[in-house]
Amino acid sequence: MDRKTRLSEPPTLALRLKPYKTAIQQLRSVIRALKENTTVTFLPTPSLILQTVRSHCVSKITFNSSCLYITDKSFQPKTINNSTPLLGNFMYLTSSKDLTKFYVQDISDLSAKISMCAPDFNMEFSSACVHGQDIVRESENSAVHVDLDFGVVADLLKWIGPHTRVKRNVKKAPCPTGTVQILVHAGPPAIKFILTNGSELEFTANNRVSFHGVKNMRINVQLKNFYQTLLNCAVTKLPCTLRIVTEHDTLLYVASRNGLFAVENFLTEEPFQRGDPFDKNYVGNSGKSRGGGGGSGSLSSLANAGGLHDDGPGLDNDIMNEPMGLGGLGGGGGGGGKKHDRGGGGGSGTRKMSSGGGGGDHDHGLSSKEKYEQHKITSYLTSKGGSGGGGGGGGGGLDRNSGNYFNDAKEESDSEDSVTFEFVPNTKKQKCG
């Protein structure tokens, strides 16, 4: 009986569990928040790279060869999604303290075979590879290079934190995304951080801040991205490097590293918008160039609207001087009119046909019988607030003189099912104390 030839193992990349667990525990709070927009790349260097892509920001965590080893240099790079079916956050699973074995095998160009082991548990699965995923690389050419001590990073987090919290039950319209402007001065060397509300924090050269390359520059980035960047770098509790790269587009590079892993963040510049407090030239000339978009613009539009309908002289002045009561502007219905006004309410500006309160002139010539017949027909339209002058679209032809008649308690329904109340007229007028 011939002995079968043992097949050679495919190229395998595995974790050195002791250093990897030390590194992953520091990053556990960051990895827990990773979502679908994160990929995991295994390289034959060996290294393991997590890359998260957000709007105007790319974050990268690289585990170096201190945490990994490889059996064969022919191992082909593999990139998979961090969010996997049934498992959820893949990298968060590897942060478990119960993990006893983890390795990736190169058996196909289209997938990666992954094995994870724990006491009394073994799991193997294949995950489809993601193709065409580029890894962002650091550029050595930078116009500004500043090293910040961990204490400076902590001060920035305390300063920015209250401005990034989402306020609940805010009645105002949502505001644009907040930004932070970073100014670098060459003489004397200084770096200043300015928020949208005008609050600023400045650091000069000392034992906490070191300037290796200085140039007068300004960059504007999203506040939430910058805050998350500082949180990512703070896990090392080591100095943080801040650089401004201007090779193709202006880019803010923020990184921190230790002996096991490196945290890198690439923030693209947020374009300056009109109305930005940082754009002082626009703020100073906005009223001259655009004519204003606030209160003055609305007043002029009302005046122009009054001029389009030639309803008589001084209409726009009447509109501006009229108190915005129940009648309102146009079609409100009687709240702004007087008791004996022939217009019958605040409808159109014409006198021939009134559309707001409506029908004030037609009730004067009706007899009591006709009023009673009309009341029987329109009694279902009667509201308890009828004496107030009619609500939104006219009160069914009622004015202030006839409102008391329709709301008289003696004219309530006499059916057996209804509840009747005795009406005692009070001749005395109530006086307001």
From Swiss-Prot:
Gene3D superfamilies assigned: 3.70.10.10
Gene Ontology CC terms: host cell nucleus; viral tegument
GO molecular function: DNA binding; DNA polymerase processivity factor activity
Bias kind Low complexity: ranges: 298-307
Keywords: DNA replication, DNA-binding, Host nucleus, Host-virus interaction, Inhibition of host innate immune response by virus, Inhibition of host IRF3 by virus, Inhibition of host NF-kappa-B by virus, Inhibition of host RLR pathway by virus, Isopeptide bond, Phosphoprotein, Ubl conjugation, Viral DNA replication, Viral immunoevasion, Virion
Pfam families linked to this entry: Herpes_PAP (PF03325)
Membrane-spanning ranges: none
GO biological process: DNA replication; symbiont-mediated suppression of host cytoplasmic pattern recognition receptor signaling pathway via inhibition of IRF3 activity; symbiont-mediated suppression of host NF-kappaB cascade; viral DNA genome replication
Principal subcellular localisation of the protein: virion
Quaternary state and interactors: Forms homodimers. Interacts with host SMARCB1. Interacts with host NCL/nucleolin; this interaction is important for the organization of proteins within viral replication compartments. Interacts with UL112/UL113; this interaction is necessary for efficient viral DNA replication. Interacts with UL84. Interacts with the uracil DNA glycosylase UL114. Interacts with the DNA polymerase catalytic subunit UL54. Interacts with host IRF3. Interacts with host RELA.
Annotated protein name in UniProt: DNA polymerase processivity factor
Species of provenance: Human cytomegalovirus (strain Merlin) (HHV-5)
Taxonomic classification: Viruses, Duplodnaviria, Heunggongvirae, Peploviricota, Herviviricetes
